[in-house]
Amino acid sequence: IILDFFSGSATTAHSVFLANIEQNLNRRFILVQIPELIDASKGSEKSKKVAKNAINLLDSMKVPHTICEIGKERIRRAGAKIKEENPEKAQKLDKGFRVLKLDSSNMKEVFYSPKETTQQDLFALVDNVKDDRTSKDLLFQVMLELGATLDSKIEESEVDGKTIYNIGDGYLVACFDQEVSDDVVKAIAKMQPTYAVLRDTGMADDATATNFEQIFK
């Protein structure tokens, strides 16, 4: 695994793709970059022009003016170009990548003293997940907590209108939707996961929650 801190425009990723093709290897990479804004007002005239062109590209993509966005687009284009120029060698080239961002906890602050806690607060804390967090946010948190690597294969399926995530061929199976039915619980059980995770408040009713506990006891 090649690790590149302050990876800029992702030249390392581009180079790894090329080396993998030339040497028939499967090296992987981790790139780390602060989402620094591109400034077209500083530096030489040449660097200003390069920065302006980058900003114009990002505007056309309707994404923020950061070096990270340039890096992501370079990885996409580099992978596509290499596959186009080396159709036979590139058949097994994995040009996919996953973008993760550092953030605060998905959980609400729940450390209150008895004097600070009202009856209304207790009801509000029944579901302690922050309102702006998505199922994917929760999924990656659980993956880290349960020891699944962040590059693990993620498969999505749908049962009874609910999304089920299968991580690492059954190592972890999770569903973070609300109103999860008995059919969803049974579908998860059939996958025989090492770990099965649902939201505390996600069960459709008490009977479903009891069934889940009995199945995975």
Language-model features: locations:
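Accessory, often C-terminal, charged low-complexity segments
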Residues: 1, 19-217
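Conserved class I S-adenosyl-L-methionine
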Residues: 1-8
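Glycine-rich SAM-binding Motif I of class I
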Residues: 10-14
